[in-house]
Amino acid sequence: MFVFIDNGAICHAPTHVSSSLFRFFEHLSNSNLNAAFEALLGLSEDTLDEKKKEEYMAKMYDIYHDFEMRSVGEQSLTQIMMKTVRCAVEDAGAVFGEEAFPIIRALMYLDGLVIRTHPDVKLISSMSPYLEEFRACLPIPEPVPRYIN
């Protein structure tokens, strides 16, 4: 069992929130952008038609253009995360709820720490082995995206 302790909060995230965010970061760390963006749709309360989904995906690809090529010293992971949340909320009807923000905030703290200590690191891709370890030890269900083909 993994227990995360954030200096600012002890909380529980509902399965659809933790699963969607886990899958998002897992796919992102493996440079599978399409699957990462699809995973965030597990937070959507809207049913997206194909056009809305295409618009959402296009905006996400714009946000993450060259993302995997740059280190934390070359880009602000915190700003990218805020753009991601905004796009998911505005274009896909995602509802993160207050339970998601300790997870996001912890990554922002990590981003700040890495910028100061190891600015050449590609933070998200370096998370991949640890996410594989989580997957091996935790039952993480697949998020169910809501959109119409």
Segments predicted by a language model, with ranges:
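Conserved catalytic cores of large enzyme domains
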Residues: M1-N149
